[in-house]
Every structure is written in C-alpha cells, then in structure tokens.
Regions:
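Carbohydrate transferase catalytic cores enriched for Leloir-type hexosyltransferases
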Residues: 1-142
Length: 142
C-alpha cells in the first residue's frame, strides 16, 4: 500500500502539533515493509523534517518572515502536490490540512482526512483570523 501525504501542514511553520502528528505517523510507517509513503513537498522550514531520510525539502529560513516568499513557496508546494495527485501513483491520499485544492484531483482513490481539533469552532470569536472559514472548509471536505 502506498500513501501520499500533501504539503499543507509542513509549509510555513517550523513546529506545530499537526505537523508533529504527521511526522510521527510517517516515522512509524518508515519502519514497515507493507506501507510505502511519499510526502509531496518541495519547500519547508519544518524542524521535524530536518534529519529524516524520507523527505528532503529545500529550507527557506532566510525568507520565513516574508509574506510574499511564503505565498510563493506555498503555491509551488501546492502545484507539486497537485501534480502528484494527477499522476495517481498512490493507493490512499492523506491530506495534512483542510484546504480543498485536491478535491477535483484525487479522483476515485480513497482518502483519509484527519480532523485534529475543534478550537476554531468552539472558540471562533477568540481566533477569528486563524479560524476564519475553517468550519466551512471542513464541511466541504466531509
């Protein structure tokens, strides 16, 4: 079985709970013979990926605080993930966050979607900027 993970949670941040979850999941899979996986990622500053042997993204820490650079690297990563989806060389797709860019690309392949928390739903008024539109995205993906 081959699992394809996308770029979303590893683009734009060095650390995070969701990226840590996927890092641990991929590390567990790395030691198994019956599971192959690929992380479709070209650019990342994630510290979790610094020393792993299954992903070697280009680091861009000198541009980490530059909004335009982050947008560019995010678009490149999304294009790369989209290309991998269209090629179809996987059995299961597991997106790492809630952006819906992949819905028209995954085809009939099975997909695993993990909802990590409901902070934005429960405390949306406190986190308007961070959670804006997140509930709607989650509903669209269901």
């Amino acid at each position: 079985m081959k699992v394809l993970y996308d770029h979303q949670t590893f683009t734009g941040s060095q650390y995070g709970g969701i990226s840590r979850y996927f890092y641990e999941l991929m590390n567990a899979f790395a030691g198994r013979q019956d599971i192959e996986f690929e992380l479709s990622l070209k650019f990342s500053n994630s510290e979790y990926l610094r020393d792993v042997n299954y992903s070697h993204p280009v680091r861009y820490q000198h541009f980490a605080n530059n909004l335009r650079a982050n947008q560019l690297f995010s678009r490149i990563n999304r294009l790369y993930s989209s290309t991998k989806l269209c090629l179809g060389n996987f059995d299961i797709f597991h997106p790492t966050y809630y952006h819906s860019y992949f819905l028209d690309k995954v085809g009939k392949k099975p997909m695993v979607l993990t909802f990590h928390d409901v902070v934005s739903e429960k405390s949306g008024s406190m986190f308007r900027v961070l959670g804006e539109g997140l509930s709607e995205l989650k509903q669209q993906l269901l």
